[in-house]
Amino acid sequence: MEEKKILYKVIEIMPVESGTSQATGREWKSREFVAEEIADVQYPNQVLLRLSGDDVKLIDGVKVGDTVELGFNSRVRSFQTKDGKTMHSQENNCWRVGLRN
């Protein structure tokens, strides 16, 4: 099956965040950005994406307004709150950013 190629416009790029894991003591870093699907529709979809570890460099050189082709995985995690309610959290982990300008 051929991979679907969708182009996005970069809307916002947040700064790199970093720290040390309390659980493992390892250093971590991440960076988020917002991209909007380039489509001929009235309300295009936007997605919040996260780059982690050395992948934070993938967005270096990309500016707000640039057109990019992205590779990312979307993952939902379910968890129980203290009162027993099931909640869900979604992560969109980006692993490819290709500048198309």
Describe the role of every protein-language-model region.
Residues 1-101:
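Single-stranded nucleic acid-binding surfaces, predominantly the OB-fold ssDNA-binding core
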